[in-house]
Amino acid sequence: MYRVFASRALRAKSLCDKSSTSLASLTLSRLNHSIPFATVDAEELSGAHPAEVQSFVQGKWIGSSNHNTLLDPLNGEPFIKVAEVDESGTQPFVDSLSQCPKHGLHNPFKSPERYLLYGDISTKAAHMLALPKVADFFARLIQRVAPKSYQQAAGEVFVTRKFLENFCGDQVRFLARSFAIPGNHLGQQSHGYRWPYGPVTIVTPFNFPLEIPLLQLMGALYMGNKPLLKVDSKVSIVMEQMMRLLHYCGLPAEDVDFINSDGKTMNKILLEANPRMTLFTGSSRVAEKLALDLKGRIRLEDAGFDWKVLGPDVQEVDYVAWQCDQDAYACSGQKCSAQSMLFVHENWSKTPLVSKLKELAERRKLEDLTIGPVLTFTTEAMLEHMENLLQIPGSKLLFGGKELKNHSIPSIYGALEPTAVYVPIEEILKDNKTYELVTKEIFGPFQIVTEYKKDQLPLVLEALERMHAHLTAAVVSNDPIFLQEVIGNSVNGTTYAGLRGRTTGAPQNHWFGPAGDPRGAGIGTPEAIKLVWSCHREVIYDYGPVPQGWELPPST
């Protein structure tokens, strides 16, 4: 039944014509068959019409006798077979990475025409994603494997396209811009260059099946690296289709390998291939293990328990409530930037903010996927966490806290109403055990709400200081003194400040990444690409001439 609901939601919007949705959806369904690179039909993908996902290595698509059969997150039907490489099939991937030298596939001194090639590939790929039928294809495919509203899925495609547009033409070679400094004598100059790592690996999660892997993959390629890409198998069909689009747009077949495997197999490849750099986006637990396994040759964008502080100046309550709802519950809370804790100044507590949050949360429905399956926590696990929180003195359930009604979501996933639990700030900070419980990240539609009085800002800042992940944050205030105090005493790498502050969004036009950790990665901007996918190399030219009358000096 819910596959029907989802299909209706998928058809409900069109990127190109919101005024005639029925006609547009019918047309796009027919046009899917003319998408030149596609090997699946997102509209038909179901238990009755399953798909198979392949890996790609050394310029060829390959299958496997080892299949991971995925269940439809909406109804439990087996609907995708992922041909996963097992430990006996890793050697081609290890060999492929080993064929790339440390100095990369291109650098400022080697094959510089490839900078132009990738500007052209970006141009063509951006053009493809600007075609309504292609954009709709990816939005609907995202919805099938990581159920979210059409607007959220289409937004992911839009950000991906804008990123590609940002690196068209000469913009790729501009990433490799060098600088020169005059030397100590005639004929000497020092030049600083951005240098690739060579063989690299990329491991990305399920929640943004297109945006995260594509932006990191292209950043790695722009700087001259040869990447091996692994996307969570639950959603890897999206990036498999994107790989086919990139090949159609001129991506050299030997430049990228793409693998479907379990974590154990991928870990084996990492240890044997010894990549010069790995980008990992995902859980903190896996991130710390990989940091040890790879001896620090890693960049991380791991989990974030992200917070929002509402300042003393109350205004635009409806807007702030709406943004809080979006930050906490869009994509069913499955964003690494999702609002996990809301600090409410006592002035806001005098407004109908919480009641408005409850009303907004109750608007979310499974039928349009504004609330949907949670892919990494079961319903039981989330409810158990809620019950543990409610044992804290003074805590209470603000809204939610129940399993979704009338759903067919398989039990391996979660199905929870948007939920908020209030915990007094004094109790949060009472002891380490309570603090760890309250700040446990639940990757789902779940948030903690607390209140602070005007003289309790130091308690808020203490709570922020004790957090171990520092990805996104929001300080909702137009009071410059308050903003200065909170921003100056916090760390989060992507912090939104002001009345319209949010924790989510992650567009392509600004840095997105954690702070406070030398291993922290960024995504999307020239600065992020250069930081993650290149290192500094200094070349000192010293041509002479040797000074006239030079004589052999004494030993020193």
Swiss-Prot record:
Among Pfam families, the record links this protein to:
Aldedh
> Which GO biological process categories is it annotated with?
proline catabolic process to glutamate; proline metabolic process; reactive oxygen species metabolic process; response to salt stress
Q: Which Gene Ontology molecular-function terms are recorded?
A: 1-pyrroline-5-carboxylate dehydrogenase activity; aldehyde dehydrogenase (NAD+) activity; cobalt ion binding; zinc ion binding
State its Enzyme Commission number(s). 1.2.1.88
Its catalytic activity? (S)-1-pyrroline-5-carboxylate + NAD(+) + 2 H2O = L-glutamate + NADH + H(+)
Q: What happens when the gene is disrupted?
A: No visible phenotype under normal growth conditions, but mutant plants are hypersensitive to treatment with proline. Hypersensitivity to heat stress.
Site positions per UniProt: Transition state stabilizer: N207
Active site annotated at which positions? E301, C336
Example of a GO cellular component annotation carried by this entry: cytosol
Answer yes or no on keyword Magnesium.
no
**CDD domains, A to Z:** ALDH_F12_P5CDH
Where does tissue-level expression of this protein occur? Highly expressed in flowers. Constitutively expressed at low levels in the other tissues. Highly expressed in pollen grains and tissues undergoing cell death. Expressed in old leaves, mature siliques and developing embryos.
Q: In which pathway does it act?
A: Amino-acid degradation; L-proline degradation into L-glutamate; L-glutamate from L-proline: step 2/2
Q: What triggers production of this protein?
A: Induced by treatment with proline. Induced by drought stress.
PANTHER family from the UniProt entry: ALPHA-AMINOADIPIC SEMIALDEHYDE DEHYDROGENASE, DELTA-1-PYRROLINE-5-CARBOXYLATE DEHYDROGENASE 12A1, MITOCHONDRIAL
**Biological role:** Plays a role in the inhibition of programmed cell death by converting the toxic proline catabolism intermediate (s)-1-pyrroline-5-carboxylate (P5C) to glutamate.
Name this protein carries in UniProt: Delta-1-pyrroline-5-carboxylate dehydrogenase 12A1, mitochondrial
Which species is this record about? Arabidopsis thaliana
